[in-house]
Design a protein with these regions (language model features):
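The alpha-helix within a helix-turn-helix
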Residues: 55
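Charged, amphipathic alpha-helical coiled-coil/dimerization segments
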Residues: 20, 70-130
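Short, locally clustered residues in the helix-turn-helix/winged-helix DNA-binding domain
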Residues: 13-16, 41-45, 106
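Short capping segments at the starts of secondary-structure elements
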Residues: 46-50
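Key DNA-contact positions within bacterial/archaeal DNA-binding proteins
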Residues: 35-37, 63
Length: 140
């Protein structure tokens, strides 16, 4: 019998699926997904980002991001606007509705963070985060 729990890729996949399920269950009442939350989080930190910069931040190709932005735009959470300084560039801007969601959605992320970190010393969390970043960077 395969010892899948010894394979880092399997464990990462299981964790990712469980985290996605956690988020999507809690985000469903707001009409958004886990990926949409990442987009909104980036915009809450820096509104008016160029589409290509947002795609880079999120490690998404432009066609995947476009689909997510289409849905967020239909939900009136963001709008895409031409950049007045560069006619070839498009900026993604939060609407008032998108900005207002922040206070409702941030506790969901805080709940998951508390669950994941419960009983784990901060230095282990930092080491784990560094290891994940290292793995991700090696696969770029």
């Amino acid at each position: 019998m395969a010892q899948l729990d010894q394979h880092i890729c399997f464990l990462l996949d299981v964790a990712t699926r469980r985290i996605t399920k956690f988020y999507n269950r809690r985000l469903r009442p707001f009409g958004i997904t886990y990926n949409h939350l990442f987009i909104l989080t980036c915009l809450w930190e820096q509104d008016g980002v160029h589409v290509k910069d947002l795609a880079h931040q999120l490690c998404l190709d432009s066609s995947s991001l476009t689909g997510h932005l289409d849905r967020l735009e239909r939900s009136a959470l963001v709008v895409r606007q031409d950049d007045p300084d560069d006619r070839r560039a498009i900026r993604v801007v939060l609407t008032a509705k998108g900005r207002d969601l922040k206070d409702q959605l941030e506790p969901i992320g805080q709940e998951l963070k508390a669950t994941l970190q419960r009983g784990v010393p901060p230095e282990r969390i930092q080491a784990f985060t560094a290891a994940l970043r290292n793995i991700s960077n090696r696969l770029e």
